[in-house]
Amino acid sequence: MSAPFFFKRSGGLTLREIATLVGGEPRDGADLERRISGIGPLDRAGPNDISFLDGAKYVQQAATTVAGACLTTPRFVDALPGQVSVLTVREPYRAFVEVARTLFPDSLRPSSLFEASGAAAGAHHPGAHVHPSARLENGVTVDPGAVIGAGAEIGSGTVIGAGAAIGVKVRIGRDCAIGANATIMHALIGDRVIIHPGCAIGQDGFGYVRGPRGAHKVPQVGRVIIQDDVEIGANSAVDRGAIRDTVIGEGSKIDNMVQIAHNVSIGRHCLFAGQSGISGSTMVEDGVIMGGQAGVADHLTVGAGAMIGAKAGVFTDVLPGARWSGYPARSGKQWLREVVTLERLARESRGGRAQDDE
Protein backbone atom coordinates (compact mmCIF):
# COMPACT_ATOMS: atom_id res chain seq x y z
CA MET A 1 0.00 0.00 0.00
CA SER A 2 1.00 3.65 -0.12
CA ALA A 3 3.19 4.54 2.86
CA PRO A 4 0.76 5.51 5.65
CA PHE A 5 3.09 8.12 7.11
CA PHE A 6 0.16 10.18 8.38
CA PHE A 7 -0.74 7.47 10.90
CA LYS A 8 1.15 5.69 13.63
CA ARG A 9 1.47 1.93 13.24
CA SER A 10 0.68 -0.28 16.19
CA GLY A 11 3.82 -2.38 15.73
CA GLY A 12 2.23 -5.08 13.63
CA LEU A 13 0.59 -8.44 14.19
CA THR A 14 1.66 -11.97 13.42
CA LEU A 15 -0.65 -14.05 11.28
CA ARG A 16 -1.28 -16.19 14.35
CA GLU A 17 -2.44 -13.11 16.27
CA ILE A 18 -4.64 -12.07 13.35
CA ALA A 19 -6.19 -15.54 13.18
CA THR A 20 -7.06 -15.28 16.87
CA LEU A 21 -8.39 -11.74 16.45
CA VAL A 22 -10.80 -12.57 13.61
CA GLY A 23 -11.40 -16.28 14.17
CA GLY A 24 -9.65 -17.21 10.93
CA GLU A 25 -8.62 -20.68 9.75
CA PRO A 26 -5.12 -20.77 8.18
CA ARG A 27 -4.62 -22.39 4.79
CA ASP A 28 -2.22 -25.33 4.83
CA GLY A 29 1.32 -24.03 4.74
CA ALA A 30 0.46 -20.52 5.95
CA ASP A 31 3.33 -18.85 7.81
CA LEU A 32 1.73 -18.11 11.16
CA GLU A 33 4.77 -16.17 12.35
CA ARG A 34 4.72 -13.78 9.39
CA ARG A 35 4.42 -10.24 10.73
CA ILE A 36 1.88 -7.97 9.08
CA SER A 37 2.28 -4.22 9.51
CA GLY A 38 0.10 -2.72 6.79
CA ILE A 39 -3.06 -3.08 4.75
CA GLY A 40 -3.94 -2.67 1.10
CA PRO A 41 -6.08 -3.76 -1.85
CA LEU A 42 -5.06 -6.90 -3.70
CA ASP A 43 -3.39 -4.98 -6.52
CA ARG A 44 -1.39 -2.70 -4.21
CA ALA A 45 -0.62 -4.76 -1.11
CA GLY A 46 2.99 -5.77 -0.52
CA PRO A 47 4.70 -8.61 1.37
CA ASN A 48 4.12 -6.93 4.74
CA ASP A 49 0.47 -6.12 4.07
CA ILE A 50 -2.81 -7.95 4.48
CA SER A 51 -5.66 -7.72 1.97
CA PHE A 52 -9.04 -9.39 1.48
CA LEU A 53 -10.97 -11.19 -1.27
CA ASP A 54 -14.74 -11.39 -0.96
CA GLY A 55 -16.09 -11.67 -4.50
CA ALA A 56 -15.50 -13.11 -7.96
CA LYS A 57 -14.99 -9.61 -9.33
CA TYR A 58 -11.49 -9.52 -7.81
CA VAL A 59 -10.28 -13.03 -8.63
CA GLN A 60 -8.10 -11.73 -11.46
CA GLN A 61 -6.35 -9.33 -9.09
CA ALA A 62 -5.97 -12.14 -6.56
CA ALA A 63 -4.08 -14.30 -9.06
CA THR A 64 -1.23 -11.78 -9.27
CA THR A 65 -1.25 -10.29 -5.79
CA VAL A 66 1.99 -10.10 -3.80
CA ALA A 67 0.21 -9.45 -0.50
CA GLY A 68 1.78 -11.13 2.48
CA ALA A 69 -1.59 -12.33 3.75
CA CYS A 70 -5.19 -12.36 2.63
CA LEU A 71 -8.57 -12.87 4.28
CA THR A 72 -11.12 -14.72 2.19
CA THR A 73 -13.88 -17.33 2.24
CA PRO A 74 -13.29 -21.04 1.51
CA ARG A 75 -14.74 -20.48 -1.97
CA PHE A 76 -11.80 -18.32 -3.09
CA VAL A 77 -8.85 -19.94 -1.31
CA ASP A 78 -7.50 -21.53 -4.48
CA ALA A 79 -7.62 -18.21 -6.34
CA LEU A 80 -4.70 -16.90 -4.28
CA PRO A 81 -1.03 -17.65 -5.08
CA GLY A 82 0.77 -20.20 -2.94
CA GLN A 83 3.12 -17.67 -1.35
CA VAL A 84 0.20 -15.74 0.16
CA SER A 85 -0.65 -16.70 3.75
CA VAL A 86 -4.41 -17.17 3.64
CA LEU A 87 -6.93 -17.05 6.47
CA THR A 88 -10.48 -18.17 5.75
CA VAL A 89 -13.26 -16.31 7.53
CA ARG A 90 -17.00 -15.97 7.14
CA GLU A 91 -16.96 -12.24 6.34
CA PRO A 92 -13.61 -11.17 4.84
CA TYR A 93 -14.24 -7.44 4.74
CA ARG A 94 -15.49 -7.29 8.32
CA ALA A 95 -12.41 -9.22 9.43
CA PHE A 96 -10.17 -6.93 7.36
CA VAL A 97 -11.67 -3.88 9.07
CA GLU A 98 -10.98 -5.41 12.49
CA VAL A 99 -7.34 -5.96 11.55
CA ALA A 100 -7.05 -2.43 10.13
CA ARG A 101 -8.48 -0.93 13.32
CA THR A 102 -5.88 -2.80 15.34
CA LEU A 103 -2.96 -1.83 13.10
CA PHE A 104 -3.89 1.84 12.80
CA PRO A 105 -5.84 2.88 15.91
CA ASP A 106 -4.95 6.57 15.44
CA SER A 107 -6.84 6.65 12.14
CA LEU A 108 -10.22 6.22 13.83
CA ARG A 109 -10.75 9.81 14.94
CA PRO A 110 -9.31 13.31 14.48
CA SER A 111 -5.98 13.54 16.26
CA SER A 112 -4.35 16.35 18.20
CA LEU A 113 -1.96 18.56 16.24
CA PHE A 114 -0.42 19.50 19.57
CA GLU A 115 0.29 15.89 20.57
CA ALA A 116 1.61 15.16 17.07
CA SER A 117 4.21 17.89 17.66
CA GLY A 118 5.52 16.05 20.70
CA ALA A 119 3.31 17.32 23.51
CA ALA A 120 2.13 14.89 26.15
CA ALA A 121 -1.46 13.68 26.05
CA GLY A 122 -3.65 15.88 28.20
CA ALA A 123 -1.63 19.05 27.61
CA HIS A 124 -3.17 22.47 27.01
CA HIS A 125 -1.44 24.55 24.36
CA PRO A 126 -0.57 28.06 25.60
CA GLY A 127 -2.29 29.45 22.51
CA ALA A 128 -5.64 28.01 23.61
CA HIS A 129 -8.08 29.96 25.77
CA VAL A 130 -9.78 28.03 28.57
CA HIS A 131 -12.12 30.07 30.75
CA PRO A 132 -11.20 29.85 34.45
CA SER A 133 -14.65 28.50 35.32
CA ALA A 134 -14.50 25.68 32.76
CA ARG A 135 -13.98 22.24 34.29
CA LEU A 136 -11.70 19.87 32.42
CA GLU A 137 -10.92 16.43 33.81
CA ASN A 138 -7.34 15.19 33.78
CA GLY A 139 -6.23 14.00 30.36
CA VAL A 140 -8.07 16.54 28.20
CA THR A 141 -5.91 17.79 25.31
CA VAL A 142 -6.54 21.32 24.04
CA ASP A 143 -4.90 22.32 20.76
CA PRO A 144 -3.71 25.81 19.79
CA GLY A 145 -6.38 28.39 19.06
CA ALA A 146 -9.18 26.45 20.73
CA VAL A 147 -11.60 28.40 22.93
CA ILE A 148 -13.48 26.82 25.83
CA GLY A 149 -16.22 28.96 27.33
CA ALA A 150 -17.33 29.66 30.86
CA GLY A 151 -18.79 26.74 32.77
CA ALA A 152 -18.03 24.18 30.07
CA GLU A 153 -17.32 20.63 31.26
CA ILE A 154 -15.10 18.19 29.34
CA GLY A 155 -14.31 14.58 30.26
CA SER A 156 -10.94 12.86 30.39
CA GLY A 157 -9.35 11.57 27.21
CA THR A 158 -11.13 14.10 25.01
CA VAL A 159 -9.21 16.05 22.37
CA ILE A 160 -10.28 19.58 21.44
CA GLY A 161 -8.85 20.39 18.02
CA ALA A 162 -7.13 23.55 16.83
CA GLY A 163 -9.47 26.51 16.49
CA ALA A 164 -12.47 24.68 17.92
CA ALA A 165 -14.96 26.72 19.93
CA ILE A 166 -16.76 25.15 22.90
CA GLY A 167 -19.59 27.33 24.16
CA VAL A 168 -20.72 28.40 27.58
CA LYS A 169 -21.92 25.49 29.78
CA VAL A 170 -21.49 22.92 27.02
CA ARG A 171 -20.87 19.42 28.36
CA ILE A 172 -18.67 16.94 26.50
CA GLY A 173 -18.11 13.41 27.78
CA ARG A 174 -15.00 11.26 27.95
CA ASP A 175 -12.79 10.02 25.10
CA CYS A 176 -14.37 12.32 22.53
CA ALA A 177 -12.62 13.93 19.56
CA ILE A 178 -13.61 17.43 18.49
CA GLY A 179 -12.03 18.30 15.14
CA ALA A 180 -10.31 21.51 14.14
CA ASN A 181 -12.56 24.58 13.73
CA ALA A 182 -15.67 22.80 14.96
CA THR A 183 -18.13 24.90 16.95
CA ILE A 184 -20.26 23.42 19.72
CA MET A 185 -22.86 25.56 21.47
CA HIS A 186 -25.91 24.78 23.65
CA ALA A 187 -25.09 21.07 23.57
CA LEU A 188 -24.78 18.04 25.83
CA ILE A 189 -22.50 15.39 24.33
CA GLY A 190 -21.94 11.84 25.56
CA ASP A 191 -18.84 9.63 25.63
CA ARG A 192 -16.72 8.52 22.65
CA VAL A 193 -18.36 11.01 20.31
CA ILE A 194 -16.42 12.08 17.20
CA ILE A 195 -17.09 15.53 15.75
CA HIS A 196 -15.05 16.05 12.58
CA PRO A 197 -13.46 19.36 11.48
CA GLY A 198 -15.73 22.23 10.58
CA CYS A 199 -18.90 20.88 12.18
CA ALA A 200 -21.39 23.38 13.56
CA ILE A 201 -23.36 22.04 16.52
CA GLY A 202 -26.01 23.96 18.43
CA GLN A 203 -26.49 27.12 16.38
CA ASP A 204 -30.05 28.38 16.04
CA GLY A 205 -32.40 26.73 13.61
CA PHE A 206 -34.12 28.18 10.56
CA GLY A 207 -37.23 29.55 12.24
CA TYR A 208 -39.10 32.65 11.06
CA VAL A 209 -42.62 34.04 11.11
CA ARG A 210 -43.57 35.96 7.99
CA GLY A 211 -45.53 39.18 8.24
CA PRO A 212 -46.30 42.32 6.26
CA ARG A 213 -42.89 43.71 7.17
CA GLY A 214 -40.94 40.59 6.33
CA ALA A 215 -39.70 37.60 8.29
CA HIS A 216 -39.31 37.76 12.06
CA LYS A 217 -36.92 35.43 13.84
CA VAL A 218 -38.38 32.80 16.17
CA PRO A 219 -36.32 32.32 19.36
CA GLN A 220 -34.54 28.96 19.42
CA VAL A 221 -34.17 28.05 23.10
CA GLY A 222 -33.69 24.27 22.95
CA ARG A 223 -30.50 22.23 23.10
CA VAL A 224 -28.64 19.61 21.09
CA ILE A 225 -28.25 16.24 22.81
CA ILE A 226 -25.77 13.83 21.24
CA GLN A 227 -25.63 10.40 22.85
CA ASP A 228 -22.67 8.02 23.20
CA ASP A 229 -20.67 6.72 20.22
CA VAL A 230 -22.12 9.13 17.65
CA GLU A 231 -19.91 10.28 14.76
CA ILE A 232 -20.61 13.43 12.73
CA GLY A 233 -18.69 14.13 9.53
CA ALA A 234 -16.88 17.27 8.43
CA ASN A 235 -18.87 20.46 7.82
CA SER A 236 -22.16 18.97 8.97
CA ALA A 237 -24.62 21.15 10.87
CA VAL A 238 -26.91 20.22 13.75
CA ASP A 239 -29.27 23.03 14.80
CA ARG A 240 -30.43 23.36 18.37
CA GLY A 241 -34.09 22.94 19.14
CA ALA A 242 -36.63 25.74 19.13
CA ILE A 243 -38.92 24.70 22.00
CA ARG A 244 -37.70 21.11 22.37
CA ASP A 245 -34.28 19.45 21.99
CA THR A 246 -32.58 18.20 18.85
CA VAL A 247 -31.46 14.65 19.66
CA ILE A 248 -29.05 12.24 17.94
CA GLY A 249 -29.28 8.72 19.32
CA GLU A 250 -26.56 6.38 20.46
CA GLY A 251 -24.26 4.95 17.81
CA SER A 252 -25.62 6.92 14.87
CA LYS A 253 -23.14 7.85 12.12
CA ILE A 254 -23.55 10.98 10.03
CA ASP A 255 -21.47 11.70 6.93
CA ASN A 256 -19.97 15.00 5.76
CA MET A 257 -22.13 18.03 4.91
CA VAL A 258 -25.37 16.73 6.41
CA GLN A 259 -28.04 19.12 7.73
CA ILE A 260 -30.02 18.23 10.86
CA ALA A 261 -32.66 20.89 11.54
CA HIS A 262 -34.15 22.09 14.83
CA ASN A 263 -36.27 19.74 16.97
CA VAL A 264 -35.26 16.68 14.94
CA SER A 265 -35.06 13.41 16.86
CA ILE A 266 -32.78 10.74 15.40
CA GLY A 267 -32.83 7.23 16.85
CA ARG A 268 -30.02 4.83 17.61
CA HIS A 269 -27.61 3.37 15.04
CA CYS A 270 -28.85 5.38 12.06
CA LEU A 271 -26.63 5.99 9.01
CA PHE A 272 -26.87 9.19 6.94
CA ALA A 273 -24.77 9.61 3.79
CA GLY A 274 -23.32 12.92 2.61
CA GLN A 275 -25.49 15.93 1.76
CA SER A 276 -28.64 14.36 3.14
CA GLY A 277 -30.92 16.50 5.26
CA ILE A 278 -33.71 16.26 7.82
CA SER A 279 -36.17 19.14 8.14
CA GLY A 280 -37.45 20.49 11.43
CA SER A 281 -39.40 18.45 13.98
CA THR A 282 -39.11 15.18 12.05
CA MET A 283 -38.66 11.95 14.00
CA VAL A 284 -36.27 9.35 12.59
CA GLU A 285 -36.54 6.05 14.44
CA ASP A 286 -33.78 3.50 15.15
CA GLY A 287 -31.70 1.95 12.38
CA VAL A 288 -32.76 4.19 9.50
CA ILE A 289 -30.38 4.49 6.53
CA MET A 290 -30.41 7.51 4.20
CA GLY A 291 -28.53 7.70 0.91
CA GLY A 292 -26.59 10.70 -0.33
CA GLN A 293 -28.54 13.90 -1.02
CA ALA A 294 -31.78 12.38 0.27
CA GLY A 295 -34.09 14.80 2.04
CA VAL A 296 -36.98 14.47 4.48
CA ALA A 297 -39.61 17.19 4.90
CA ASP A 298 -40.64 18.60 8.27
CA HIS A 299 -42.95 17.12 10.92
CA LEU A 300 -42.77 13.55 9.58
CA THR A 301 -41.91 10.15 11.05
CA VAL A 302 -39.47 7.77 9.37
CA GLY A 303 -40.06 4.32 10.85
CA ALA A 304 -37.42 2.06 12.34
CA GLY A 305 -35.22 0.24 9.86
CA ALA A 306 -36.44 2.19 6.83
CA MET A 307 -34.04 2.83 3.93
CA ILE A 308 -34.24 6.02 1.88
CA GLY A 309 -32.45 5.91 -1.47
CA ALA A 310 -29.99 8.52 -2.73
CA LYS A 311 -31.56 11.80 -3.92
CA ALA A 312 -35.00 10.73 -2.68
CA GLY A 313 -37.39 13.43 -1.50
CA VAL A 314 -39.66 12.28 1.35
CA PHE A 315 -42.89 14.23 1.89
CA THR A 316 -45.02 11.72 3.85
CA ASP A 317 -44.48 9.40 6.79
CA VAL A 318 -42.42 6.27 6.07
CA LEU A 319 -43.48 2.96 7.60
CA PRO A 320 -40.95 0.86 9.56
CA GLY A 321 -38.77 -1.28 7.32
CA ALA A 322 -39.89 0.42 4.10
CA ARG A 323 -37.54 0.92 1.13
CA TRP A 324 -38.24 4.23 -0.58
CA SER A 325 -36.68 5.87 -3.64
CA GLY A 326 -37.33 8.66 -6.12
CA TYR A 327 -38.80 12.14 -6.09
CA PRO A 328 -41.29 12.39 -4.61
CA ALA A 329 -40.22 9.30 -2.70
CA ARG A 330 -42.36 6.17 -2.74
CA SER A 331 -41.87 2.43 -2.51
CA GLY A 332 -38.65 1.45 -4.25
CA LYS A 333 -40.44 -1.25 -6.26
CA GLN A 334 -43.11 1.19 -7.39
CA TRP A 335 -40.48 3.76 -8.37
CA LEU A 336 -38.56 1.19 -10.44
CA ARG A 337 -41.78 0.08 -12.19
CA GLU A 338 -42.52 3.68 -13.08
CA VAL A 339 -39.00 4.24 -14.42
CA VAL A 340 -39.25 1.11 -16.59
CA THR A 341 -42.72 2.12 -17.82
CA LEU A 342 -41.58 5.63 -18.72
CA GLU A 343 -38.59 4.22 -20.58
CA ARG A 344 -40.85 1.84 -22.52
CA LEU A 345 -43.32 4.62 -23.39
CA ALA A 346 -40.50 6.89 -24.51
CA ARG A 347 -39.06 4.13 -26.69
CA GLU A 348 -42.46 3.43 -28.23
CA SER A 349 -43.00 7.12 -28.94
CA ARG A 350 -39.75 7.07 -30.92
CA GLY A 351 -40.92 4.15 -33.00
CA GLY A 352 -38.69 1.68 -31.20
CA ARG A 353 -35.48 3.67 -31.68
CA ALA A 354 -33.03 3.43 -28.79
CA GLN A 355 -32.56 7.20 -28.64
CA ASP A 356 -33.58 10.44 -30.30
CA ASP A 357 -32.07 11.34 -33.65
CA GLU A 358 -30.43 14.38 -32.07
Task: Give the role of each language-model region.
Residues 52, 118-119, 123-331:
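Structural signal for interior beta-strand "rungs" in well-ordered beta-sheet cores
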